[in-house]
Amino acid sequence: MRDYDEAIAFLGEWGPFQRLIFFLLSASIIPNGFNGMSVVFLAGTPEHRCRVPDAANLSSAWRNNSVPLRLRDGREVLHSCRRYRLATIANFSALGLEPGRDVDLGQLEQESCLDGWEFSQDVYWSTVVTEWNLVCEDNWKVPLTTSLFFVGVLLGSFVSGQLSDRFGRKNVLFATMAVQTGFSFLQIFSISWEMFTVLFLIVGMGQISNYVVAFILGTEILGKSVRIIFSTLGVCTFFAVGYMLLPLFAYFIRDWRMLLLALTVPGVLCVPLWWFIPESPRWLISQRRFREAEDIIQKAAKMNNIAVPAVIFDSVEELNPLKQQKAFILDLFRTWNIAIMTIMSLLLWMLTSVGYFALSLDTPNLHGDAYLNCFLSALIEIPAYITAWLLLRTLPRRYIIAAVLFWGGGVLLFIQLVPVDYYFLSIGLVMLGKFGITSAFSMLYVFTAELYPTMVRNMAVGVTSMASRVGSIIAPYFVYLGAYNRMLPYIVMGSLTVLIGILTLFFPESLGMTLPETLEQMQKVKWFRSGKKTRDSMETEENPKVLITAF
């Protein structure tokens, strides 16, 4: 009896066909990188102050002193949300009184920005914040906008796998590309914050669905040796490339509507990929469409300049997927040991996700150039992914994950010790923290898959990755803490990251251990460990079914 991989082994692992699929599917991830982080510039909040109408009868001295000062980071700046009561200072101006000399400004009555705001255009010309005045009493709408995008990501995670199982990988891949690109384009015509946010939620659904289906399609078409590299370096690195393109677009296009228009262009350029990316032969076989699957394999063999056997699938009945025991979510809590491990995994995924997305979204709040900071935040991800891949090949999982979490959280805690004038050092520490947390995040898929038995492995990875979506939903509010104290987000994120690093040490080690098949074969969390564990040689290849559901 031959399985699918044996039936197509004659194709080889890394011919022209595999290289083309690797590159095209990875390239299809690029729009996900800038769409996923576009809110950084679409909803950027520029410096602002209360507007004083030109019609107000004020002397130049009173006009220049119409907005009170407040302390921010140890220095006095103009208040963003208050002004002196206009009727009062207009009366003083008419009487010829001078501010500060004849009138004590500290005793004057203040009022809110009844005539709107004046926004600085030094960094942004136009954002959704300036469009709909999402500041002061309405500043809560900015993190909510981002959170609702990630709610869409959560919803898309639920449906993307089911849709691709029902309608095919290729069809759903391009349909979700169209959703992501099309609804991003529709956002340009938003007439209200509510309309923009609802459309943004739908963009989030398309964004993650495209990512997941491209991942599934690649892991099903590519061979075992290439599959692992594709699932770690391929999709992650190209996501980071898209992320790096975002600040480049935003630097030259500082109007939010024009920026959105520019960001839809790469999605349109993906349309020709339809004629180069095939359907998954594995999926076609599962649908008993054997002739179509053979046609794809024959074309691949021709591209690789390899002779095709007379019969590729000699016993189609034997190639049907093996039936697996049905699992339920409650199986992840069936015993005390697996329940503790599941709860620990949920916390690890959620809080690592909070750190990753909060640091990514916080780049405009760093000192210096917002566009350069965003680019550096994206650039640091590439060495982080490469480092994670290299570490996973030889070193114990729980120790390396804990180490990079300690690194990431520790440097974030050091930021509060840096003098305000040394902002370049603060930025460097933030990037080092992002490096550590990104490395840890990319390792969690493999680690979780190795801990759980076959019967619940896919479900475990799926449920824990859902926890990471919850983390991304609450991450914008960690950034929002900076409105109260500039250091507060780093103190909270750093502390939580160090704590989950400690938590990671209580997981069992999975390197060198045979993948468990049943709940009884699962290793115990550290405080339940007793007796001597048997160490078996680990299979050199990952379980394909694990990799398919990893992201």
Swiss-Prot record:
Q: Activity regulation per the record?
A: Allosterically activated by intracellular ATP.
GO (cellular component) term, any one: apical plasma membrane
Q: Which PROSITE patterns match?
A: MFS, SUGAR_TRANSPORT_1
Q: What Gene Ontology molecular-function terms does this entry list?
A: acetylcholine transmembrane transporter activity; amino acid transmembrane transporter activity; amino-acid betaine transmembrane transporter activity; ATP binding; carnitine transmembrane transporter activity; PDZ domain binding; symporter activity
Intervals, Cytoplasmic compartment: 1-20, 163-171, 219-232, 279-337, 393-399, 448-460, 508-551
TM stretches of this protein = 21-41, 142-162, 172-192, 198-218, 233-253, 258-278, 338-358, 372-392, 400-420, 427-447, 461-481, 487-507
Record carries keyword Transport:
yes
User: Which residues have a glycan attached per UniProt?
Assistant: 57, 64, 91
The places in or outside the cell where this protein is found are:
Apical cell membrane; Basal cell membrane; Mitochondrion membrane
Q: What is this protein called?
A: Solute carrier family 22 member 4
